Amino acid sequence: MKLGGNDGMFDTALSMNPTMPLYDDKGNYYQPSSPTGARNPVAELKDIDNNGQRLYVLGTAEAKLNILRSEKQTLNTSLSYSLHYNDLKQQYFTPSTSGESYWNGYKGRAEVTYQKWYTQRLEWLVNYALDVQNHSIKAVAGYTYENAHWERLQASNNDFAYDNIKWHDLGSGSYLTDGKAQMATGQSASKLIGTFGRINYNWKKLLMASASIRYEGSTKFGKNHKWGAFPSASIAWEIANMDFMKNASKVVKSLKPRISYGVTGRSDFDSYLSLATYSTKGSYLMNGEWVKGYAPSVNANPELGWEKSLSVNIGVDFVLWNRLRGSIDWFDRQSKDLLYNYTAPQPPFVYNNILVNVGTTQNRGIELSIDGDIFKGTKVEWTSGINYSYGTTKLKVLSNNMYQASYVELYQKPGVGTSEYFFRVQEGGKVGQFYGYEYAGVEDGKMLIYTDEGEKVPVSEADAKYKRYIGNGTPTSFLSWNNTLRYKNFDLSIFFRGAFGFDIFNMRRYGMGLQGAGTDNVLRDAYLKDKNIVTGGGVISSFFLEKGDYFKLENVTLGYNFTPKPNKILNSMRVFVSAKNLFTLTGYSGNDPSIVSVNGLTPGVDSNSAYPTATQLSLGLTLRFK
């Protein structure tokens, strides 16, 4: 499996000065005039070898036993085992002609990495069902055991006699002889045990209720909080089946208000965060010999526990005239006991920070889903559906009596020696807010920003106290629109989607949008739209923020269904042509805004190395055999 040269080469090709040659006078690849300059992308892609071989095994086995089966009752049990196994070998080599070798003064670098990880899961289930007159009960109980393991070995060496040696003779590089070769190993393991039960009740198809409890324990947590209980419950009422709704039965086919509450636990992070771990800390001379030293690197926290997600949902489902279907939901989702590093007193703690459960975020909003048969029972049938959601996420809690923090800074700006962060979140504030300087115009070629007192100063006089919230990378609403049309044997599907109410930090404009970008390539706007601004980049400011709203035609598929003559082999045949990413309506000047990540705590930062979205055309054939 060829992994390619370097993931950042697309950005490098864009930013490289277009007047620079690919080769020098001697026929070798041209290298930049400084080690911080843009690397030669052709040299990086053609000369660097980055290969990998992966073995992936997915296996499952299950045994079922029917204990009781009658007209009114059923009882069965099952035992299942699954294995997910990955074995990865990676080999990397950069030759003596590469920019890395040129600027670091060695002849090539080779690296070999081996990784193996697997997850074993054993699950036992017992299912029971009872139907008596107007009552229907379904219950399930179970036990889960999960074992996960990961291990890694990495070794690298530099300065080889010949480039064609690559990684095949890793020990021949001079760095091993000089004691500068690198080697690293690591492994982790975790176990999870869970028991659970769930019961569903249905009375006359009028009242539906469900309740469940899951009790889980994980080795990842502190000794005092390894176990967690996660309950859930829901209830729904089918009003359309009530006697007083009979007169409206031709119109109202279903009207079901419902409410649900649930708690889930999160444990998908590193295995040893609750333990005091050790790492190497230099070498020390003992009895005439140098001995590698070890010291604590993380404080232990026996109180480290589960992150919990609490969800309340109130909604209603409806079906009208047997052709209009939909649902309306209000939701309140809270994530509690979120992990964060806080300042720890010394003593008693060895390190000055500790990972603890403190934070709480809250996501509230509404969701609307409607689809209907616009044309039904006619030559042309058309079904159309719209999904819309609106919501905001806030940081509700960041501190408690023991651990205090006034704000959290997230996503450090890339670059050497930088200390700026794109985001700041404080208690009561929205998640995903950009924090930086407010653009105030230009003067004598210098970008200006506002001070905390509203004055205008050059970026060179920027002070951290001038920063403010300048935008938000999280969309306030999402919209999707799906359409399906049928005419005789033809079918056509058209899908749109969009996001609204958010900003994107244009990293390409930040890096290449001003004339003062040095010897790098720059955007055309640097000499046209923004021609008056020569300097002032390098800081996070609203100048580089743009509205990210978009609405795009995501997919169009046209198909034709053939009806084969009676035969013993073929049941049906369908041919189709499909197109993806046909167009996007947006005011954003950077990459396709739909591929910019807008989820999580650090949304709305565009990537320099993201490839442009391509329009894809495909032709397909579907055959169904008897």
Describe these PLM feature segments.
Residues 285-297, 334-358, 392-474, 482, ...:
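Surface-exposed, extracytoplasmic segments of Gram-negative outer-membrane nutrient-acquisition systems
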Residues 94-96:
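Membrane-interface helix-loop junction between the first two transmembrane segments
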Residues 102:
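The feature captures the catalytic groove of carbohydrate-active enzymes
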Residues 1-92, 105-418, 485-488, 545-626:
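Extracellular/periplasmic, surface-exposed regions of secreted and cell-surface proteins
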Residues 477:
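Metal-cofactor-binding active-site regions of metalloenzymes
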